[in-house]
Amino acid sequence: MEFLKKLVGDKCYLSPADATLADKVARWSNDLRVSVRTGDISDMITVDAQREYLNGMNEGGYAFYIIDSENDEAIGVIRLMRISHIHRNAVLGMFIGDSNHRNKGIGTEATKLILDFAFNVINLRNVMIETFSFNERAINLCKKIGFKEIGRRRNAIIYGNNEFDEVFMDILNTDFHESIICEVLK
């Protein structure tokens, strides 16, 4: 499958998401290692339900497939959602569905690409993420890029006999200094 190269980095590029990969995304969404981190572990996600969800993802937001630059393979999804153009903010959601591509810096680069888009194309000033206290990989990724923790909802999620906080982090446009888009304009 040929993907469009909307935002291009060294390790990955972002291609507008649609329902063509519903089978693959449904497999990822039903993978326990993915769904436990996204909070969707109890959701019953069929291919048809995933297709319907993917078809609506770009309504009121921007959704992209994360594509590995080495082999043009879709490995995850990243999106801006709950966008307020009045208050110029949004929520970012992301996962690397293919476990062979985790811990290689691709998630970091994909996050930087979508933040560049958020701040320098659609002119947002604040982007927030919501994750869980056990998801140290996501928390560390966000801290490395410049996100700051802004609050917690204590004991918000229960898995087995374990309770975990929901962690809220955000980044302002003034905290983000890695723009590919601004370089293109020079």
Name each model feature, range by range.
Residues 142, 147, 169:
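Conserved active-site tyrosine of GNAT-family acetyltransferases
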Residues 98-100, 104, 133-134:
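Active-site acidic-Proline motif in GNAT/NAT acetyltransferases
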Residues 103-117, 140-144:
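Conserved acetyl-CoA-binding loop-helix of GNAT-fold acetyltransferases
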Residues 43-100, 172-174, 184-185:
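Acetyl-CoA-dependent GNAT
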Residues 1-51, 175-186:
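A short, well-structured alpha-helix characteristic of acyl/acetyltransferase catalytic modules
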Residues 128-131, 148-164:
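Conserved catalytic-core motifs of GNAT/GCN5-like acyltransferases
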Residues 107, 111, 135-138, 155-160:
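Short glycine/proline-centered loop/turn elements that form peptide/ligand docking sites
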Residues 120-130:
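Conserved GNAT acetyl-CoA-binding A-motif
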